[in-house]
Amino acid sequence: MNKKYFKKYSWVLILSTSILAPMTLASCNHNVAKKEDKTQNDSSNLSNKTNKSDPNDHLKDKDKNVSQDNKDSTNKAVSNENSQTQSQKTNESSQNTKDDSSKTSNLITNQNSSSNTKSKIQENKQSQKDQNTSAVNVSALEKQTKNDENISLVNSKDTNVILKNDEKVALAKDDSKEKSKNSSNLNLKTPVENRQNKNEVKDDKKALQWWQKLNESASILESFSYDQTSLSLTFKEGMPLGLEVVLKLENLDSHEEKEISFKTTNGKVQNVLLTSSNLTSGKWKIKSFSFDKTYSHSPTIETTFDFKTNEKLKQERIEKIQKAIDKYQIKIKQNYKDKPLISKYALSNFDLNLNFKDLEIVNNSLKFDGSNLNQDLKSEKQMKITFEKVSENQANKTRKAHFKITTLDNLVFEKTLEWSYKTNKEYLDEFKNGSALWDDLQASLTSVFEKSLWHPYQLPKAKSKINTINLINDVSASFQGYDYLDDFNGSAKLKFKLQRGQEQRDITFTINGFLKVSLIDPLYKGNLRNSEFDVKASSNGYWLGQYYTAAEVFKHYSNGKSYWYATANDGNPWLEFS
């Protein structure tokens, strides 16, 4: 075979391959489309059979139809994908064919270039025609593939229409089981619906919040306040529930920065507790705050506040209470300044100056509100003052009262009151003729004896009444006995022990006003004694061979027995005349 015929034969073979390959692919796509049509017809027949079945079983059949429809839909999707894949392969094959044809043509041309220049030109023209023919075939194949895809989409839509008609027929046949079917429909959501719901949720999350729509210079914080324990932030619009907000605070003195995070509540006003923030005492301001760690904003209003730690607040509170207590004035009542015993002092002995109408003192304690003590202590409720004790310095002659003032949370403060006093010894040393204490004792004794019209010798009868006499200035006088009696003058000198507190003093005190024993027989005639008096005695004794009776005393002095003896064994001799 000569070279000329060999070249022609080669070109015929190449052209045949270029034409037959696209036709073969188109035939395959046509067969696939026929199979899909057959599948759709089977699905339609199955749906019609379902409509003719027992109405009581329509739910069960519907489940099967939905399952079958899902399978058909899946098969169609696979078929469409295969068709598209096959079309792509056809295009690639056509392109490869063109490349191979071009390579073969170039190879043959190069081999025969040395023999015939004219043949080479003709061959190039023929190659250009073949390429144009191949491009036309590829374009026809692509159009055929698009037509197949359109037919597949139309068939899919027809299938969906048939399914919807089936559902309407089932609803019309069994209205009594509508709720059950709705429940089944909810459980039989297609994957497409689920994907749509997920997309809606994602769209909601992607929606911008109101503060994200504002520029950085816009103000989103309307107002700000601070109450020693928390910050109150009022935003321009309401905040959603559970949004994480991070506040960045800056100390204006030390430039220290702190971050505080909190979760928002529904509404415009948000409260941020600072009790556990570990902030140091000083002036702070809100430097910025961020939402969900993505959007940051710097306030455009004044947000400076003077933060104080719990220790600082407590210290200031203690100082305020102590300052009020230092100004608080307690006074000792005048008549209690010189009490004999300091152990006998009580809270009632002091003027507390608490603006109380009725003092309810219990166990030397009194409850009151802080405002009664000082107007700066209005926040202090149920304070209490308790009397502790009184101490004294005898050398300086001063006494000091000790009080304890407590708050409701058991903060304890001390208050003292000091004053000068008069000692017990000084009071007892004042007992002398003409003093108030002297006159008081004299008046007390005189009232006893003058009212009784007693003689001095009758003082023993008064002992029970003068055993202890309470005098002024807390002084007491205890009767100790007689010093002497003066019957003729109606006077007696008595012994007493004065006492004030632990201090004592022995005194003698002469009183007058007793009935006097006058001279019965001033002329000593003695003739009136026996006739005027009845004489009685406890006993009559014997002395030196003679009896000395009481009656002998009232005889004339010349009798020689002008005195009376009692017997030796008379333990309590007495003489009575009337």
Curated annotation (Swiss-Prot):
Changing residue 41 to S: In strain: KD735-15. It comes from the Bacteria. GO terms for cellular component: plasma membrane. InterPro entries: Lipoprotein-assoc_dom. Changing residue 127 to A: In strain: KD735-15. Residues 41-50, 75-96 have a biased composition (Polar residues). A lipid is attached at residue 28 (S-diacylglycerol cysteine). It is found in: Cell membrane. Residues 1-27 form the signal peptide. It is a lipid-anchor. A lipid is attached at residue 28 (N-palmitoyl cysteine). Keywords: Cell membrane, Lipoprotein, Membrane, Palmitate, Signal. Transmembrane segments: none annotated. Residues 35-135, 172-203 are annotated as: Disordered. Residues 108-119 have a biased composition (Low complexity). Residues 51-74, 172-181 have a biased composition (Basic and acidic residues). Changing residue 110 to D: In strain: KD735-15. Belongs to the M.pulmonis LipAB lipoprotein family. This is Lipoprotein A. It comes from Mycoplasmopsis pulmonis (strain UAB CTIP). The gene is lipA.
